[in-house]
Amino acid sequence: MEFQAIILCGPGKGLEPLVSPLLPKALLPIANKPMLYYALEWCQRAGLSSVVVVCSSSAEQPISKYITLGYNSMQTSKSMKVEVVAHDGETGSLVKALKDKIKLDFILLPCDFITDLPPQTVVDVHRNQPLKTIGTGIWYKNSLDTMDKQTLKPDLTIHTPISNPYPQLLDIYPRPKANDQVHVRMSMLWEYPQATISTSLLESFIYVFSRKALDYDFGGGGESLKWKKPWTSVVRDIARDSWRHAKSADRDTVGMYVVPQEHSFIRCKSVSAYLEANRLILKQSSYTLPPTTATANGAAIGRDSLVGIGTVMEEKTSVKRSIVGADCIFGRECRLSGCVVMDGVVLGDGVHLDNCIIGNGVIIEDKARLVGCTVEGRYVVREATQSKNEILRGYSAEGLLDTSDEYEDEADEESDEDEDEDDDDEVDDNDLVESEGEGIDVDDDDLFDRS
């Protein structure tokens, strides 16, 4: 059984101000390699022969340039064909629109995941599912204590027990606000009395699906409106169909797999997650890091750090647990700890940075002290500035561009809260039971806002 891959590259609104029209999310560097590189390498290790990279029309040119001049030029084997396709719209309609390009069963991937879970494990899980399983989704639990829990916001995932030989997805709901009620259908509980509601499972947005899913009929006949939705909503509707119809025993199902605790998995959907992904790569031995070739004129570069080509550091500068890009210039007595510094950054003398992310081409003048800050590309931090936990950004023409029509996939941060009401029209009120929200582990009362 062979597979094709579709990699979705959203705009990355949660990664502002690091992203820009010139530096889309998929090209943000992680350990001095574009984010997209890791998704492509995962596909390469899976032995896939065909990959379609989907992005917004505004990001098509820089991503195509990277594929042609960057990724392809580094590959000794040309066995995997990579094609870039622009699409502005929902991910459900995107998958349907790619029907002519999808010749095999397919794997849907985000561009922003970092994991040591072997791709063969994911493929084998799907291959071993019962025949009626039309697709398999991957979920994971956050294993990083340093992650900002407020940015995770998992949905309510209803499924058969994970301990079952073949766990099955039954439904997905946006996580409710505190004290809100969750409506659970009686028809589902009659058929699956051991159904479990999970509040800690996070969607990886990795799905393995049979090609026949592209012809799935939701009961509307022909081109159903249900395809004009985010992909997560399409998957949810297929899962619901498996139990809410009279002949549910014959319906297609969606399998589930939860990443084991011994494996790491992270998605770069926020600035804090992006910082952790860089640290995770430094710890993992499964990825080959580029060589450190900085000119260190008496500077101390820790073995737990990575420094790009052409970077120059003056005496008494210290770099620990940090990743520094190419062609940077660091003055005397600079101190970096736990930072990500992108290409072309200039640091004056005596600059101290702790747990910061510094964008491309930033200039930080003498004796500045930044702790936990994110600095937009090309920004100038004035001499002796002292900032803590701030976002430093300017107001450039790039920042004022309207990107509201860009392709936005739920692999980034899409909410389908409004669609639940539309999909419930055919369900009788007597088929619903209510679960009080106070019985659910809720972190805050603004959980429907995923922006």
Where are the language model's segments positioned?
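N-terminal glycine-rich phosphate-binding loop and ensuing alpha1 helix
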Residues: 1-72, 119-125
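Short phosphate-binding loop-to-helix
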Residues: 58-108, 115-117
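Eukaryotic complex-assembly/interaction regions
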Residues: 71, 75-83, 136-141, 221-223, ...
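Hydrophobic residues within beta-strands of alpha/beta enzymes
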Residues: 51-53, 106, 136
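Short beta-strand/turn micro-motifs composed of small residues
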Residues: 9, 55, 110, 137-140
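Catalytic-core segments of class I nucleotidyltransferases/pyrophosphorylases
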Residues: 106-107, 114-115, 120-131, 144-287
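Left-handed beta-helix
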Residues: 223-451
